[in-house]
UniProtKB/Swiss-Prot annotation:
The gene is msrA. InterPro entries: Met_Sox_Rdtase_MsrA_dom, Met_Sox_Rdtase_MsrA_sf, MsrA_MetSO_reductase. It comes from Geobacter metallireducens (strain ATCC 53774 / DSM 7210 / GS-15). The active site is at 16. Belongs to the MsrA Met sulfoxide reductase family. Its EC number is 1.8.4.11. It catalyses: L-methionyl-[protein] + [thioredoxin]-disulfide + H2O = L-methionyl-(S)-S-oxide-[protein] + [thioredoxin]-dithiol; [thioredoxin]-disulfide + L-methionine + H2O = L-methionine (S)-S-oxide + [thioredoxin]-dithiol. GO terms for cellular component: cytoplasm. This is Peptide methionine sulfoxide reductase MsrA.
Length: 162
């Protein structure tokens, strides 16, 4: 009998990927995280290219999780709490489409859950402005450079620029 859990992926963009990755790494049931790029047209983009805002990519975190231990709905709940989804193409001082709020879905079930979650958040009364989060089908995930992986953890914690 195979005891290996069936793992799933979720991909989120919520500003600087250092902060996003650190938040999801704390979640019980998340077995791995990877900082990277998604949503653009350039293959194998570098950090410098993504920051130039000419690749179309967002900084994202790929979350590998065990759905028997943490649900996709719980990951969505966390996503909404770790950034301001009403800021268009920015988070705090980080400005540009590469810092956009985005949920990349991997399955039709994830798409449905993401849309329902966004509708619920939008009607929650938590925000004075409309939610501008993009929901899109996952495309190729490009790993960020090694120095970006678990960046804050390697430096003893901290936060991004804000």
């Amino acid at each position: 009998m195979d005891e290996t859990p069936e793992l799933e992926k979720a991909t989120f963009g919520a500003g600087c990927f250092w902060h996003v990755e650190a938040e999801f790494r704390r979640v019980s049931g998340v077995v791995a995280t990877h900082a990277g790029y998604m949503g653009g047209w350039k293959d194998h983009p570098t950090y410098e290219e993504v920051c130039s805002k000419e690749t179309g990519h967002a900084e994202v975190v790929e979350v590998v999780y065990d759905p028997a231990r943490v649900s996709y709905d719980e990951l969505l709940r966390i996503f909404w709490t770790i950034h301001d989804p009403t800021q268009l193409n920015r988070q705090g001082p980080d400005i540009g489409t590469n810092y956009r709020s985005v949920i990349f879905f991997h399955t039709p079930e994830q798409e449905q859950a993401a849309r329902l979650s966004m509708e619920k958040e939008g009607g929650s009364g938590r925000y004075s402005r409309p939610i501008v989060t993009e929901i899109a089908s996952a495309s190729a995930f490009w790993w960020a450079e090694e120095y970006h992986q678990q960046y804050l953890e390697k430096r003893g914690g901290g936060s991004c620029n804000w």
